[in-house]
């Protein structure tokens, strides 16, 4: 294929600005699917994406477009997620493309994630075409949004395209702009094969499928390929493209994006960002690859049935193949048994992974309280990264604790600025900058990550009636007053309920958990003490009263000493029972108690 007739582009935007709808219209215009197969969010293949109305996985499709110059061009479209938790998917898509369509809602204007994604595109040396969507809305104001793009992003918006993805207005102009304004890929077909591994996933029938972008050379069926990170050699079984259906082709050449299968059994051989080359003619050096993304939110996931542990392990492996930013390792809990400590990019990422495990693999799971990574320095001078309360150690052995802080960018209409700033201050935030573009405030705050990952995004949305937007990036580790809150039942610590929180919140959190457990744990024959402790200090306590058996019911008067003797005997029995008996805490009580921690 002549690479001058190929255009690789990503669609980037803030969440809900119409990326997937525009992708639908482009597919429709290029006759990628017939009318019977067309549906909304056609590239969002997971049920969870359709239900939530969001894109989670970046998707690709090749379209054939006959332009006004009479030539047929092949457009490789990559639809990307808009939520901050899935920004890694955006980065990978941009690495496979030469240009981007920047979609901005003409009624909402530039939002925080718009800025974050467009800066990624600029860093990738992309040609950017601004597209103002939803121009058919009464509240649309294209001129104001053009000024906002130039003012806040710093790119020329005078030739922005005006479209309505929903009604199909301006779609032809978008296709012509892609052909005329975006560059063709560079590279030479006669060079040794050099391809970047963009994504991987597991297919029940094909095994591991690899999505790749050819930078140099050609890949075809039967060719022996090498993964340059570990020199693993495989023979290509199939080569294909997405139209958006899978379509097998003879070969992929320079500039093309497609998939291969090669009977790959080892999940560890498929590293996203790896360079793939030919065994006979290896390329001289690998491609730069992608920046390594490290998880920032951690929680433990346990199967509710002990026999499901191996199924959970296999499910996690398959999901990790499809999502390189997700990590897991085995963990053992006294209360919940065998499970895994998992790492995520944010709370939405956590929710999506848990929901996919339950839906796609039919698993019944319990998740513990989410937490972040702390930097703990012991009195002996050792520095450890800790995200599991179990590894936190005793307070008397700790010299210093640092917690991760982030730099948050919040865009908010000025009438909601006051409540948003109050929220940031309540979350221990430090204001860095405040600027305006029209009646929109651009607010920059430094905040502890632990305060942001739980409910911060939801609260910003609710306080601003949905108009505020948030983007954030990791900043640095700073000294902090952090403590491990332990929950004890009859003086025995319950590891599954321990959490790491700021010292200012230990009493409130401890009281909430103790009260919840008091309602959930059934009464026993003896008194049960539920305590929340920091080190050796008890910060909250609740007591569950015992059942009382009336041992004096059979007495008919007589000497009072007989009555006292029976009561004393009962008291000793209960004391002995309390010292040797384990409190039977129902599994459901753990699940309900963990909800309060969330």
UniProtKB/Swiss-Prot annotation:
It comes from the Bacteria. GTP binds at residues 16-21, 133-136. GO terms for molecular function: GTP binding; GTPase activity; guanosine tetraphosphate binding; ribosome binding; translation elongation factor activity. It catalyses: GTP + H2O = GDP + phosphate + H(+). SMART domains: EFG_C. It is an enzyme of class 3 (hydrolase). Residues 4-186 form the tr-type G domain. One of its GO terms (biological process) is positive regulation of translation. It is a peripheral membrane protein. InterPro entries: EF-4 (IPR006297), EFG_II (IPR041095), EFG_III/V (IPR035647), EFG_V-like (IPR000640), EFTu-like_2 (IPR004161), G_TR_CS (IPR031157), LepA_C_sf (IPR038363), LepA_CTD (IPR013842). It holds the Pfam family GTP_EFTU. It is found in: Cell inner membrane. Keywords: Cell inner membrane, Cell membrane, GTP-binding, Hydrolase, Membrane, Nucleotide-binding, Protein biosynthesis. Its EC number is 3.6.5.n1. The keyword Cell membrane applies. GO terms for cellular component: plasma membrane. Its main location: membrane. Required for accurate and efficient protein synthesis under certain stress conditions. May act as a fidelity factor of the translation reaction, by catalyzing a one-codon backward translocation of tRNAs on improperly translocated ribosomes. Back-translocation proceeds from a post-translocation (POST) complex to a pre-translocation (PRE) complex, thus giving elongation factor G a second chance to translocate the tRNAs correctly. Binds to ribosomes in a GTP-dependent manner. PANTHER family: TRANSLATION FACTOR GUF1 HOMOLOG, CHLOROPLASTIC, TRANSLATION FACTOR GUF1-RELATED. Belongs to the TRAFAC class translation factor GTPase superfamily. Classic translation factor GTPase family. LepA subfamily. This is Elongation factor 4. It comes from Ehrlichia chaffeensis (strain ATCC CRL-10679 / Arkansas).
């Amino acid at each position: 294929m002549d690479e001058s007739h190929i255009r690789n582009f990503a669609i980037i935007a803030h969440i809900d600005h119409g990326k997937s709808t525009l992708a639908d219209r482009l597919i429709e215009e290029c006759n990628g699917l017939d009318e019977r197969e067309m549906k909304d969010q056609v590239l969002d293949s997971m049920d969870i994406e359709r239900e939530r109305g969001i894109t989670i996985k970046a998707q690709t499709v090749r379209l054939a477009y006959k332009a006004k110059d009479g030539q047929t061009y092949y457009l490789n479209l990559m639809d990307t997620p808009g939520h901050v938790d899935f920004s890694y998917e955006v980065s990978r898509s941009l690495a496979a493309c030469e240009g981007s369509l920047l979609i901005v809602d003409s009624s909402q204007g530039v939002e925080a994630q718009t800025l974050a994604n467009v800066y990624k595109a600029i860093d990738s040396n992309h040609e950017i075409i601004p597209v103002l969507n939803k121009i058919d809305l009464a509240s649309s104001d294209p001129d104001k949004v053009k000024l906002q793009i130039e003012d806040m992003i710093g790119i020329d918006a005078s030739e922005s395209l005006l479209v309505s993805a929903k009604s199909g207005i301006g779609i032809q102009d978008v296709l012509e702009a892609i052909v005329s304004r975006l560059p063709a890929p560079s590279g030479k077909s006669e060079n040794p094969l050099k391809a970047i591994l963009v994504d991987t996933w597991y297919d029940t029938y094909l095994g591991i499928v690899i999505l790749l972008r050819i930078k140099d050379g050609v890949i075809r069926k039967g060719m022996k390929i090498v993964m340059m990170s570990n020199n693993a050699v495989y023979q290509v079984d199939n080569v294909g493209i997405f139209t958006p259906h899978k379509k097998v082709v003879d070969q992929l050449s320079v500039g093309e994006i497609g998939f291969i299968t090669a009977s790959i059994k080892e999940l560890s051989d498929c590293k996203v960002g790896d360079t793939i080359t030919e065994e006979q003619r290896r390329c001289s050096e690998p491609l730069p690859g992608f920046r390594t993304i490290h998880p920032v939110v951690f929680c433990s996931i346990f199967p509710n049935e002990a026999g499901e542990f191996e199924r959970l392990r296999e499910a996690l492996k398959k999901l990790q193949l499809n999502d390189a930013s997700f990590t897991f390792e085995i963990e053992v809990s006294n209360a919940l048994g065998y499970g895994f400590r998992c790492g995520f990019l944010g709370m939405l990422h956590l929710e999506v992974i848990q929901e996919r495990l339950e839906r796609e693999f039919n698993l019944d799971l319990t998740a513990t309280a989410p937490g972040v990574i702390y930097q703990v320095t012991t009195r002996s001078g050792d520095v450890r990264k800790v995200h599991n309360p179990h590894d936190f150690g005793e307070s008397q052995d700790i010299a210093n604790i640092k917690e991760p802080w982030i730099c948050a960018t919040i865009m908010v209409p000025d009438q909601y600025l006051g409540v948003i700033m109050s929220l940031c201050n309540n979350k221990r935030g430090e204001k860095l900058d405040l600027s305006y573009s029209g009646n929109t405030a651009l607010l920059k705050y430094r905040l502890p990550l632990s305060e942001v990952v739980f409910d911060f995004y939801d609260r910003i949305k609710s306080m601003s009636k949905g108009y505020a937007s948030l983007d954030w990036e990791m900043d640095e580790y700073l000294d902090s007053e952090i403590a491990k809150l332990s929950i004890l039942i009859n003086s025995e610590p319950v590891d599954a309920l321990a959490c790491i929180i700021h010292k200012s919140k230990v009493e409130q959190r401890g009281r909430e958990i103790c009260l919840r457990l008091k309602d959930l744990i059934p009464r026993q024959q003896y008194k049960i003490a539920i305590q929340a402790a920091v080190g050796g200090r008890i910060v909250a306590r609740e007591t569950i009263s015992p059942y009382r058996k009336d041992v004096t019911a059979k007495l008919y008067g007589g000497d009072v000493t007989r009555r006292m003797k029976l009561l004393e005997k009962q008291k000793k029995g209960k004391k002995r029972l309390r010292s040797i008996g384990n409190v039977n805490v129902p599994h459901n009580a753990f699940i309900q108690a963990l909800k309060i921690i969330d």
